[in-house]
């Protein structure tokens, strides 16, 4: 387990040099907070990983935060084929802007969103 506020270093070479090292907090019971470091700032928004036999990511953060979230998931041992579900609570860009990038990085994951938001995720225009 990771102690709260531990900073986890970059997991692999797949993340470019501009991606900040993920900040991961162990919330207990296999739940982790991942600071998305929105716009390069810590403490604004977070994603949550619920580990288990079918890991679930709640919220993706912005598209610019997606590499940080992917790096954090890798540091937590979640590979491209491990993530089962991505849940977005609503489709504001700070919560769901990274869905496309996360879905690409984790092609096996099912994206779950309210039916009213689904069409906007597919076509935000």
For each feature predicted by the language model, list its residue ranges.
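Short, positively charged and aromatic/hydrophobic N-terminal segments
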Residues: 10-11
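Conserved beta-strand hairpin/beta-sheet module of binuclear metal-dependent hydrolase folds
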Residues: 18-76
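Active-site HxH/HxHxD metal-binding segment of metal-dependent hydrolases
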Residues: 43, 64-67, 74-125
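Metallo-beta-lactamase
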Residues: 14-29, 117-125
């Amino acid at each position: 387990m990771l102690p709260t506020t531990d900073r986890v270093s970059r997991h692999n070479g797949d993340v470019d040099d501009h991606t900040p090292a993920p900040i991961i907090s162990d919330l207990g019971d296999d739940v982790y907070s991942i600071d998305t470091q929105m716009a390069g700032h810590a403490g604004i928004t977070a994603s949550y990983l619920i580990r288990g036999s079918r890991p679930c990511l709640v919220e993706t953060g912005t598209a610019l935060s997606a590499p940080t979230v992917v790096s954090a998931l890798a540091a937590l041992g979640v590979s491209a084929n491990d993530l089962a579900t991505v849940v977005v609570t609503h489709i504001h860009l700070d919560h769901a802007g990274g869905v496309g990038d996360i879905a690409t990085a984790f092609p096996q994951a099912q994206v779950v969103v309210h039916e009213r938001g689904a069409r906007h995720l597919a076509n935000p225009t």
